[in-house]
Amino acid sequence: MAIRRICELPEPILRKKAKKVPSIDGSIQTLIDDMIETMKSADGAGLAAPQVGVSLRLIVFREPDAKEATVLINPEIVKKEGQRQVTEGCLSIPGYFGELTRAETVTAKGLDRHGKAFRIKGTGVVAQLLEHETEHLDGILYIDHLESEEKLHEIQPEDEIPEEIRD
């Protein structure tokens, strides 16, 4: 496993439509392992293959309280329900977060890392991850959904925590 460099805006790969994974071979298994390691190293909740410079339809993400990362190859969102206001960031747009609307519930289908077809229905944060990561595969970023520039915020450095109260 290797930690890969995360592509950042304005790198063109982030705006291109990714190609379907033609077959799940050793190179795809390595890519999956590298993406999971990279996501964990960057303390991210999800990662799409284009974010590590590979234009393939593959995403990984961490569901809250799950032991293993979820892998979805050639994902397709088949249903969206409801709406909710969310705050969202992206490893490819460091230093910023935005306020936008996402679906409350998302159902997606695709293949697991072994080529087995499955469906996943996510609500709340999981729905947000499915939508965000799948959009990466079509060159869409969360900033494309912002209603106005005022909805994009720069992350401010945290105040220094006194040594005596650090964990």
From Swiss-Prot:
Recorded source organism is Dehalococcoides mccartyi (strain ATCC BAA-2266 / KCTC 15142 / 195)
Which InterPro entries does the UniProt entry name for this protein? Answer: Peptide_deformylase, Peptide_deformylase_sf
Key word Protein biosynthesis present: yes
Which sites bind Fe cation? C90, H132, H136
Swiss-Prot/TrEMBL catalytic activity: N-terminal N-formyl-L-methionyl-[peptide] + H2O = N-terminal L-methionyl-[peptide] + formate
Q: How many cofactors are bound and how?
A: Binds 1 Fe(2+) ion.
Q: Name one Pfam family in it.
A: Pep_deformylase
Tell me the GO molecular function terms.
metal ion binding; peptide deformylase activity
Family the entry assigns: Belongs to the polypeptide deformylase family.
Which UniProt keywords are listed?
Hydrolase, Iron, Metal-binding, Protein biosynthesis
Task performed by this protein: Removes the formyl group from the N-terminal Met of newly synthesized proteins. Requires at least a dipeptide for an efficient rate of reaction. N-terminal L-methionine is a prerequisite for activity but the enzyme has broad specificity at other positions.
Extract the signal peptide range. none
An annotated GO BP: translation
The answer to whether keyword Metal-binding applies is yes
What is the required cofactor set for this protein? Fe(2+)
Q: What is its EC number?
A: 3.5.1.88
Report the active site residues: E133
Tell me what this protein is called. Answer: Peptide deformylase
